[in-house]
Amino acid sequence: MNPRRKKRLLITSLLAVALSLAVGLVLFALQQNIDLFYTPTEIIEGKKETGIKPEVGQRLRIGGMVVQGSVKRNPESLKVSFDLVDNGGGIVTVFFDGILPDLFREGQGIVAQGNLLNATEINASEVLAKHDEEYMPPEVSEALVGMDNFKANNK
C-alpha cells in the first residue's frame, strides 16, 4: 500500500471513529430527556407488550385517575400526596411539592411527571390536569376505559 492510500485510510478511519463518538454522545445526552408514559398497572406489572418495568430513579410520566379520598395535604407546606389508579386496578402513590393545577380534583384523570422512588411511589416534579371538560390525553383515556366514573367518549 502506498503512503498516499495509507494517509487516506487513516483519515477516513479517524473520521468514522469521531462520527461514531459524536453520535454516541448525542444519544447519551438525549437519554436524559426521554420520559416514557406508564399507567399505574404498567409500573407495577410491566408493559403489556414487553413486560418491562421502569427502574427506580427513572424519569417517567404516569397517567391515571386520582382515587377518591386519597389526597393528603401537609398544612405546613405545599407537599401533597395522592393515589392514582387505572382500569387494571394498579394503585401508585404520587408525592408532589408545589402548587397543584386549579382543575386538579379527586376522581379526575391527571398526568404526573417525575422519578420512580420504588415499585409503587413516584416523586412528581409536575402535575398536569385536564384543561377542559372534554379533553383527555389518549394514553390516559385508554388506561381509564371501564372505570365507573369515566366516560369512554372523552376525547
From Swiss-Prot:
Membrane disposition: Single-pass type II membrane protein
One Pfam family here: CcmE
Main location class: membrane
Intervals, Cytoplasmic compartment: 1-8
Compartments in which it is found: Cell inner membrane
Membrane spanning residue stretches: 9-29
Annotated keywords: Cell inner membrane, Cell membrane, Cytochrome c-type biogenesis, Heme, Iron, Membrane, Metal-binding, Signal-anchor, Transmembrane, Transmembrane helix
GO molecular function: heme binding; metal ion binding
Residues annotated to bind heme: 131, 135
GO CC terms, sorted: plasma membrane
Segments on the Periplasmic face: 30-155
Superkingdom, natural source: Bacteria
Biological process according to GO: cytochrome complex assembly
Signal sequence segment: none
InterPro entries: CcmE (IPR004329), CcmE-like_sf (IPR036127), NA-bd_OB-fold (IPR012340)
Family: Belongs to the CcmE/CycJ family.
Function summary: Heme chaperone required for the biogenesis of c-type cytochromes. Transiently binds heme delivered by CcmC and transfers the heme to apo-cytochromes in a process facilitated by CcmF and CcmH.
Name assigned to this protein: Cytochrome c-type biogenesis protein CcmE
Underlying gene: ccmE
